[in-house]
Curated annotation (Swiss-Prot):
Covalent lipid sites (S-diacylglycerol cysteine): 22
PROSITE patterns, alphabetized: PROKAR_LIPOPROTEIN
Keyword Cytoplasm: no
Keywords, ordered alphabetically: Cell membrane, Lipoprotein, Membrane, Palmitate, Signal
Keyword Kinase: no
Principal cellular location given in the protein's record: membrane
UniProt name for this protein: Uncharacterized lipoprotein TP_0839
Amino acid sequence: MDKKARAHTVIVCLVGALSLACAYLLGGSMKYLRGDVSRFWTSSRMQRHPAHSSQPVVRTFTDADGYTCLDQAHPHTIVIDATRVRVSVQVCAQRRSLAYKVVKNSVYDPLSIHLDPTMLVLRRGKKTVRESTPPADSPGVMQSALNVRDTLRDWFYTFWKNVWGSRWGHSVVPIEAIICVPAQHNVHNLKVRVKDSSLRLEGIEVRFADVYAHASELKLNGVRTDRTLLHTTDGDTQCSRCVLSDAHLYTDRGTLSFDGTLQGNSEIGTRTGTVVARFTERQSYYALSVFSGHGAVYINDQRVRKTLGTCLSTGGSAQLCVRNERGVLHVYFPQ
């Protein structure tokens, strides 16, 4: 074979390999863009991933509202490995099981949200699916151009990530996990693990919960907690109008803000961050332990020093006192 023939063969092989690579990458991008969740769980890419290679196929069914529901008889943990993903989950009315629905799913940087049939997060009432509804008419030129731009951008990020790996400086895109709970249900045995995201719990009662948020923001609004552990690493935790009963709220390096009532002995704390707590009424005989570590503690807008016998005004008729026991600040309302 002469040099020209060899060169021609090499060129053909290179073009073929490049075409196959482009088809693979573009196919992966389109799979993400379609939001094809059922294929996403069982795709060869997921099966090759070492973290999921041993997991069985998850059995699902579709309810009347179009939600993909997890079969409660198979409570395997599901990992959504994607980014800019907005997940809406509710309890399916048919089998009282967990449902999930990916509303938006594109492929920037990897992020894992762990879901299992005992995990219900966010808000009571109706579904909070936040997806843009397409216009009744055909899309205009501008919308078509935006769609093409988004497709090319997702394809580029897929190509960049698959070829060069995640070590080349991808920025983390925060996401928000949205999970719905019917108004008549409370949440028991809640287990949540989130990373680089914003997690909100609103207007629900959680019991026996274990929530861990890494480099994330945790917001609780009108939540009643009973024997619950909420822990964040770098992010901030906000607990507004919360009712604590045997609850433990921690943040390693962030800011922990709390205002609400106590219905059981509870603990809030930080290692090197800041604790801001506010109470307005007498909370019976229940006490709140504050672990401040090397951080700062503010109660009712006053800096609390680690001294004995500190009492603060609540703005009402009650008085709030802080007791130091071996470095732990115990907040209580004296009888």
